[in-house]
Swiss-Prot record:
Organism: Pseudarthrobacter chlorophenolicus (strain ATCC 700700 / DSM 12829 / CIP 107037 / JCM 12360 / KCTC 9906 / NCIMB 13794 / A6) (Arthrobacter chlorophenolicus)
UniProt xrefs under Pfam families: UPF0102 (PF02021)
Molecular functions per Gene Ontology: nucleic acid binding
Family, as annotated: Belongs to the UPF0102 family.
InterPro entries noted in UniProt: Restrct_endonuc-II-like, tRNA_endonuc-like_dom_sf, UPF0102_YraN-like
UniProt protein name: UPF0102 protein Achl_2213
Length: 132
């Protein structure tokens, strides 16, 4: 496995552990379809959480949150809908959370969580939030 892939997997492991400490139930990891991949699918109460995890060794090339823009959020929305269709589930509330992990390998990794960057109900339009 490439170093980049190992770092990404490590970041996802840390993110999953973090989400579990918040009481979320991890339903699936690394779900793929023709549209792309969801890093983590979780349940937070009655909300289905589509979690995007971005991991970096440093901030030299920007904060991990900067790698998740409107196009990526729209794709995650579509992926969440595809995941539900694949399982014949109707989740009234879905949201996208973004988790940033910075781990330079020399100390404690830093995990940051943006909850509800985008969310939608089955009967309402998508609500986009800006974290900038």
């Amino acid at each position: 496995m490439k170093a980049k892939d190992l770092l990404g997997r490590h970041g996802e492991d840390l993110a999953v552990g973090y989400l579990e400490t918040l009481g979320m139930l991890i339903v699936e990891r690394n779900w793929r379809c023709s549209e792309g991949e969801i890093d983590v699918v979780a349940l937070d109460g009655d909300a289905l959480v589509i979690a995007e995890v971005k991991t970096r060794r440093s901030l030299d090339y920007g904060h991990p949150f900067e790698a998740v823009g409107p196009d990526k959020l729209a794709r995650l929305h579509r992926l969440g809908a595809a995941w539900c269709r694949d399982r014949e589930l109707r989740m009234p509330l879905r949201r996208v959370d973004v988790i940033a992990v910075v781990d330079d390998g020399g100390g404690s990794p830093v995990v940051e969580h943006l909850k509800g960057v985008a969310e939608w109900r089955s009967d309402a339009p998508i609500l986009w939030r800006s974290w900038a």
